[in-house]
Every structure is written in C-alpha cells, then in structure tokens.
C-alpha cells in the first residue's frame, strides 16, 4: 500500500512516531533503494526510548498491512484487472503492465481515500513534522545507516512539497506513476501513452469506488 493508505489505519492515533513509523519503510526505500533494513528482526536494539519504540511499532504495522494486502483476493483481482485495462494504453512502453497494475491500484486507493474524505492529509503532515529529527536519526543509525544526510534531504523535500495532496486529482496519478517508473526507465511513457493511461485509470476508478473500502475494513479487522 502507499503512504495515505497506510496512514488510514493510524488516522485516529495521535502519536507522531507511530504515524511516521507506519510510512517509514517506504520513505527509507525512496531515499535510497539500496537500503534494505529489518529493525523488526532486532527488536532489542530499540527498547531504550519510548519514541524509538513507537517508530518500531509503526514500522511493524506497515509490514503487517502490506502482508495482508498483498495476499488478499482484492489485491490479486484488481491488480490483474487494471493490468488488463491499461495494457493497450502503454503498447510499446518498456514498463510491464503487471508492474503498473500493482502501483496503479495502490495510488488509486490513496486517491479514493481523499475523494471520499476518509483521511485528512493536513493532519498527517502535521504529525510527521512533530517528530524530533534527532530521535529519527538515532532510529536510522541503529539500522546501520550512517548517511542520514541522504535520508533527511529526501524527507525534508517530502514534507515541504506535500505532494500527497496531488493524489486527490486522478489525472495526477499518471504523473506519479511516471516518476516512479523513471527510477527504472529513463523514458517510460510517451505523451500519448500517458493520455490513454490516464483515461483508463479514471474509468477503472469508477469501478473500484463502490468496493474499495472492503479491503480497508478487512485489514483493520486483522490488524486491530
């Protein structure tokens, strides 16, 4: 799941460290895709400070949410249906429809949460801005990452630009997909492909809107 979908499960929690921990695995990977850390396997390292423990608590919830989501019939069905619906839109693109179907589904879920006013993005940004950088730095250092400047460079941009607001606009999802794909391919889509991809996703959002909440309810039951 993407940032806002993860936040959905902590939307009623007021602990900034738990909320940040819930999205931290993706932030770490976005800052440097070579970083592959597993704090959940070294719990004893994170027991001396309550805020550090809260970051770890959120981290573990993130992993559990993704595990439930990616093994659900909802995910398997809709990522396949999106793949089928967009494959003609991206003919000739180096991007595989399967890859795009997976990411598109996650971004559409974020979009629907915003469209239905089920989360408050401003509260999300407010909470993560309350996290003490020194505590976050210590958590990252405990995971054997020394180059925290690299992380905080990305994290500061993430907080400043607040690009998650853009997910409320379905047309901006294609832009987000392009940015993600550009990490792997220099020119993932032509302008014409982007146009047709956007139309396909807008159409699929209509199909998804009537049932997307079921997956959040399912995960919530298993998580809590």
Question: Which residue stretches match the model-derived regions?
Answer:
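Amphipathic alpha-helical interaction surfaces
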Residues: 66-70, 115-118, 183
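Active-site-proximal alpha-helical scaffolds that flank and shape metal-associated catalytic sites
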Residues: 82-155
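An N-terminal structural lobe/cap that precedes and organizes the functional/catalytic core
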Residues: 1-99, 195-224
């Amino acid at each position: 799941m993407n940032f806002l979908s993860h936040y959905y499960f902590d939307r009623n929690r007021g602990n900034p460290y738990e909320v940040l921990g819930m999205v931290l695995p993706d932030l770490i990977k976005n800052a440097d895709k070579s970083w592959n850390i597993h704090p959940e396997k070294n719990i004893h390292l994170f027991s001396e400070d309550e805020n550090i423990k809260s970051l770890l608590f959120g981290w573990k919830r993130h992993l559990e949410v993704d595990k439930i989501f990616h093994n659900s019939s909802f995910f398997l069905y809709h990522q396949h249906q999106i793949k089928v619906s967009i494959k003609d839109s991206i003919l000739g693109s180096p991007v595989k429809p399967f890859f795009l179907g997976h990411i598109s589904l996650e971004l559409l879920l974020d979009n629907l949460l915003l469209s239905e006013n089920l989360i408050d993005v401003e509260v999300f940004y407010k909470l993560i801005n309350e996290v003490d950088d020194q505590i976050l730095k210590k958590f990252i250092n405990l995971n054997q990452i020394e180059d925290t400047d690299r992380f905080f460079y990305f994290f500061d941009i993430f907080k400043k630009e607040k690009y998650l607001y853009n997910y409320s606009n379905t047309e901006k999802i294609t832009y987000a997909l392009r940015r993600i794909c550009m990490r792997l391919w220099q020119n993932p889509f032509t302008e014409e492909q982007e146009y047709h991809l956007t139309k396909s996703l807008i159409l699929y959002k209509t199909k998804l809107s009537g049932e997307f909440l079921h997956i959040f309810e399912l995960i919530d039951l298993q998580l809590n």
